[in-house]
């Protein structure tokens, strides 16, 4: 049986937040205060929709955005890790569950030639409209009270594993790699024998450190892709 690898995107695969990185397109690299202050807790995707509308009003086009986005740095050691996974697809299935959007993730993965590593990317659907403005929608509707309105990562993970099982694709273990507060919910889905890998010093790591009883799986903290790579090599040896 294969191991399922689940990755967050922002501050995990890449070493920044793709949504806030796009602000570099704006003259002065700063959004108007009114727009910045319009964010409501749990409604980040709606907020980003307003940001993208503003970018369109400023005459910022697809090619401008793409040029900025492909310059975003990968987390140290992450491209080596992804190439290793790509070379061992007989042992690993690999998915992304992210609060970013389809356009940004596709640009960034394709530029580094690592898009084929991932079997599936679950994120907010985005597209350029008829006048060239970027639009984004919520990924799905859910009833989780702890997750933002656009995406419950636990629900996505549960449904993916169930669908795979129905197609006779069962996993020996799940490894979840993430950093943020919204990665806690899916980590609670993990069972004994699975591995939760929170990024050191980030929100997920802090949540788990406060109460390890939240998680049934093994916990392995990481700082660079090299540490995750070492862990995966050990899995292959056993």
Curated annotation (Swiss-Prot):
Listed cofactors: Mg(2+)
Binding sites annotated in the UniProt record for substrate: 19, 99
Record keyword Metal-binding present: yes
Cited Gene3D superfamilies: HAD superfamily/HAD-like
Enzyme class: hydrolase
Active site: 8 (nucleophile), 10 (proton donor)
Molecular function per GO: metal ion binding; phosphatase activity
CDD domains (alphabetical): HAD_Pase (cd16418)
PANTHER family: PHOSPHATASE, ORPHAN 1, 2 (PTHR20889), PYRIDOXAL PHOSPHATE PHOSPHATASE PHOSPHO2 (PTHR20889:SF1)
NCBIfam families: DKMTPPase-SF (TIGR01489), HAD-SF-IB (TIGR01488)
Name of protein: Probable phosphatase phospho2
Source organism: Xenopus tropicalis (Western clawed frog)
Top-level taxonomy: Eukaryota, Metazoa, Chordata, Craniata, Vertebrata
Gene that specifies this protein: phospho2
């Amino acid at each position: 049986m294969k191991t399922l690898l689940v990755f967050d995107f922002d501050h995990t695969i890449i070493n920044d937040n793709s949504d806030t990185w796009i602000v570099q397109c704006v003259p002065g690299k700063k959004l108007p205060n009114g727009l910045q202050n319009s964010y409501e807790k749990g409604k980040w995707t709606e907020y980003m929709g307003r940001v993208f509308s503003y970018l369109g009003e400023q005459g910022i086009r697809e090619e401008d955005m793409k040029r900025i986005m492909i310059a975003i740095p990968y987390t140290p050691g992450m491209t080596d890790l992804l190439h290793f996974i790509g070379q061992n697809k007989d042992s690993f299935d690999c998915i992304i569950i992210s609060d970013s959007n389809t356009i940004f993730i596709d640009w960034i993965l394709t530029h580094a030639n690592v898009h084929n590593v991932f079997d599936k990317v679950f994120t907010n659907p985005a597209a350029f409209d008829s006048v060239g403005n970027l639009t984004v929608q919520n990924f799905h509707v859910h009833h989780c009270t702890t997750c933002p309105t656009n995406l419950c990562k636990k629900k996505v993970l549960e449904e993916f594993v169930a669908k795979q099982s129905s197609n006779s694709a069962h996993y020996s273990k799940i490894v979840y790699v993430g950093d943020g507060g919204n990665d806690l919910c899916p980590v609670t889905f993990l069972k004994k024998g699975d591995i939760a890998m929170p990024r050191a010093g980030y929100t997920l790591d802090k949540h788990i450190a406060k109460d390890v009883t939240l998680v049934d799986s093994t916990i392995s903290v990481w700082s660079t892709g090299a540490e995750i790579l070492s862990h995966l090599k050990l899995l292959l040896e056993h």
